[in-house]
C-alpha cells in the first residue's frame, strides 16, 4: 500500500457547532483494480467508507459501509484491503478531495466528478461557504478493462463539452448551510437531506441523483449553486457588520443569451436569478446576532419569444410566438413566484417604448397584455403590481437622475414587501439551527417541479418569533418577514436590470441597518461611502452574471457616469464589450449551450441516437410553434384593442357582457387558462411606429397611447387593476398600477445628493391591510404650484379629467369619424 489515510487537516473549516462537527468535509479516494474506496471523516473523528464498483462501469454500483470507524480502525481496514489486492497492484491513493459533485455517463463508462481544491469565500452564522478552485473527472472503469472503441470519438467529444462548464468559476457550496435557499426560508422552513438537492438553484441535482438514489443520503456529495457570492465587512458608527450579496441562478431553462429566451411550457423563464442581500452584526459567538435579508428576482420576459443567432446582425430580430393565446405559461410563472415569495409580485419592466424599428416595444406591449389578462382573474389583493419604465429614455434625459428615481420606486416596493429580520441567540448558532442535514433519506421519486415553491402561507406559519427560542437575559426583538418580491427585467436581464437591482439594494440597505440599530435613519444618501461600496458589489455581480449568460461583462454606463468616469473611456469600454458579447453569442454559445444541457441532464447521450451537436435544437425552441418573424418587409393589418372592458370587439358584443370565466379560483387566485375565454387584450407601444410600415402583431399593436384618444388622462381604468397611472408624456414611457407616475416624474430635477426617504406625497399600505389597489396610492396631488403648471399645455383650461373610461367617454373632436368609429366599436383600422 503506497499510502494510508491521514487526517492532520481533516478538521479544516469546522467550529464548535454540532452541525459542523457532524458533516464530512474532507475525503481521500483510493483504488484497486476492482473498486474505488472513498474515505470520509468529520470533525468528531468518525470515519466512513464508500465502495464504488469498477468492473461494471456502465452501471453505477455504490455501497456505503454502515459502520462508523475510528481513525485506527479505518487504517487497519485499508491495510487489509491492500494486502488482499497485492496481486493486482494493491491499494493506491488517487487524490484528496472535498466532496463528490456527481456521476455522469455518456456512451461508455460512468465518470466521477470531484472537488479537488476549494477556497473559503465567506461565512453565514458560523457556516463556512466555499467556492470550487479545482475539479477532476475520473473514469470508473479501470484502464485494463476493454472499452468500445466504436464510440470513442464521440465519447471524447462529450467529455470536452462537459469540461466547458468551468466549475472553478462562480460555483459555490457549504457543507452545513443550505446555501441554495434564502436566509428567511432556512429559518422558517426546516427542510434537509435529499429534498434540498431538488431545489431549482442546485445545479448538480442531475449529477447527484444516482448517488442519492443508491445511498439514501447526501453525506458524500455537495450541492453546487451557480451565480455570485461576495462578502465584505464594513463599519458604520463604530460598529462592524457583514454585507453579503448572493445571486443564485436557476437550473431551469438555463443557457446562453440567444439560445434561451423567454419562457417554456413549464413556466420557467430564461436567466432566472434570485438575488439576496444579507446584513448581519459582526459579534462574538456567545452574543445574540441580529441579521436581516432581502430578496429580489430577475428573469426573462415571461412570453414565448426568441432571437435568431446571427453572424450578420449585432441585434437580431425578435420572434414572438402566438401559441400561448391565454398566457397559460405566463400565469404558471407568476403563480410559482407567489408560491416561492408570497404576494405581492411587483414587476419592474425596463424595456424601451419608442423605437424606429419595433423590437423591444413589441414585447413591452405584449407583456402589458399578459399582465392585464392575468390580473382579471385575481382577487384585488393578489393582483400583479407593475411599473413599465423605459430606463433607456430616462437615462438619456439630462433632467433626470435615474438612480434616484429608481431608488424611489425601490422604496415603494419595499414598503409593500417588507424585508426579513431575525435575532439569533447563541444557543441557536451553536446547535446548528439552520444546518444542512445530510442523513435524511431521499426516498421520494424525482420530480422536476419539486422546487422551492411551497405555499408561502405555510412558510409564514412555520416561522416562529425568535423569542420562542431566546435564552439568557438578552432582549429579543420581534421578527419581520418579507412577503412578495420585486421582479425586474429588461431584454437580456443584465445591464439595465442590474442598475435597478442596485437601486433596490441601496434602498434596502438603509432599512436593514436601521432595523439592526446601526443607523438612526432608514435611508442612505447616494454620495455616502456605503452607497459607493454597495454599487461596487452590484457592479461586480452584474459583470459575473453577464459573463455567464451574455458572454461579456455588463454595460455599466449608469455606474460609470455616477463615478464621473471619462465619457470617451466609457464609450470605448462599452464598444469592446459589445464586440465581445457579439462574438461569443455568434460563435461560442452553441457549444456552451450543449455543455450546459449535458451538465444539467437536459440532454442525455444514447447509443444509436443523434448527438447533441447534431441537433442544435435549443436555438429558438421557445418560439418554433406559430412564430412570426419581425422582418422589415412583412406588413400586418393593425387592430386597435383598448383595455376598457366596455369597448366592443369584432363580434360587436360588449366585452363586459360576455360570459365570464369559471368562478373556481385556486388558493392563490390564479385561474387555469383552460377555464378562461379570452375576451380582450390591451395594447400600448411606440407612437411613432406607423400602422402600415413597421411590422407588428395584431395582438400587440404599436398604437397611440390613450392620451391621444381621451386627452391628457393621468389615471385610467383597467380590468386588471383599479387604477393605472400614466406618464404625462405621450410616449407612454411610464405606466404603473402601484406608483403614481406624476409623483415619480416630479423628481426629474432631483439633485444627486438627495436621499431616499418615505415620500411625503405617497402613502403605501400593506396588501394585507387593503381590499383595493385604489388604497395603495393616495395623497398624490400634494404638488407645488410649479409642478401643477408643468403639465402639457393642452391640459390648461380643460374640464377635470375623469378617472374612469367607458363607452360614454367623450372622444376628442379633432379626430375623423372613421377613427371615432374604430375606437368605439373595435374594428380594424384600414387605409
UniProtKB/Swiss-Prot annotation:
The phosphatase catalytic core motif (or RXNCXDCLDRTN motif) from the SAC domain is found in metal-independent protein phosphatases and inositol polyphosphate phosphatases. One of its GO terms (biological process) is phosphatidylinositol dephosphorylation. Residues 448-463, 796-805 have a biased composition (Basic and acidic residues). Its cofactor is Mg(2+). Its EC number is 3.1.3.-. It is a peripheral membrane protein. The PI(3,5)P2 regulatory complex regulates both the synthesis and turnover of phosphatidylinositol 3,5-bisphosphate (PtdIns(3,5)P2). It is found in: Vacuole membrane. The gene is SAC4. This is Phosphoinositide phosphatase SAC4. Ubiquitous with a higher level of expression in young seedlings than in other tissues. Residues 439-475, 785-805 are annotated as: Disordered. Keywords: Hydrolase, Membrane, Vacuole. It catalyses: a 1,2-diacyl-sn-glycero-3-phospho-(1D-myo-inositol-3,5-bisphosphate) + H2O = a 1,2-diacyl-sn-glycero-3-phospho-(1D-myo-inositol-3-phosphate) + phosphate. One of its GO terms (molecular function) is phosphatidylinositol-3,5-bisphosphate 5-phosphatase activity. The lineage of its organism: Eukaryota, Viridiplantae, Streptophyta, Embryophyta, Tracheophyta. Residues 162-551 form the SAC domain.
